[in-house]
Amino acid sequence: MSHYPLFADLKNRPVLLAGAGKVAERKAESLLSAGAHVRVVAETLNPQFQQWADEGKIAWLGGLFEEAMLDEVYFVIAATDDGVFNRRVFEAAERRAKLCNTVDTADLCSFIVPAVVDRGPLKIAISSGGTAPVLARKWRQIIETLIPLHTGTMARIAGKWREKVKQTLNNVEQRRYFWEKLFDSRFGIFAAQNNIEAAERELITQLNRETPFGGEVVLVGAGPGDPGLLTYMLCRRYRLRIPCFTML
């Protein structure tokens, strides 16, 4: 593994962004959405950056980069079209032991930013380790079509009730079974309809069942008997250690 994957909490943390063009704009959008305090060093601002500056959403430090600017920031992103300037920022970050990402220049990065599928609290990061960014973006597009938008709603409701479920079901296996069953129930349908009240009622109903970890046996047809034809549902039952019988 060439890079260590992680998700960073940037809420109220200062970060430095070098550049104020279109590429830097996309970086700034994601940083702001994560709650970061974005400091921008650039000679000029494009209209979007200017609007953010006028609204107090970013701090514009002007166009002169000084190494001391790195002292108080969490990390720096170099997103200009000036390769010499980007290298200068990276080398300064190395001296100050600060993480630096230089857009589209893997050898000037101490960290990389993955392609992300964003479904609210649920986020999936895809990275090629800087070797093939277009391939990572391609797979992001594919995965985005597989994960419905209401997955984020499901995750938010689950997060709200997680502690209650933990208090009610003190066994890890019970809790895992409960969540697996819930996410396959009408709970997902209600979440897709943005009917939060109905989704929570479904959660409460299942949680209040007298035997939430009751027994279950599954009978599955396996066609010609090829194990590669086992359905996803059967594989999930195996993970939950539910006895399964196949008909050949």
PLM regions and their residue ranges:
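ADP-ribose/adenylate-binding Rossmann-like module
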Residues: 75-81, 86-113
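Hydrophobic beta-strand scaffold residues
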Residues: 38, 60, 99-100, 245
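Short beta-strand and adjoining strand-loop segment in the mid-core
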Residues: 35, 39, 73-83, 122-130
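E1/E1-like adenylate-forming module used to activate ubiquitin-like modifiers
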Residues: 100-152
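Glycine-rich, highly charged phosphate/nucleotide-binding loops
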Residues: 53-71
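Short loop/edge segments at beta-strand edges and connector loops
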Residues: 42, 60-64, 104
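Glycine-rich, flexible N-terminal cofactor/catalytic loop recognition
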Residues: 3-48, 52, 67, 214-248
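An accessory alpha-helical subdomain
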Residues: 130-211
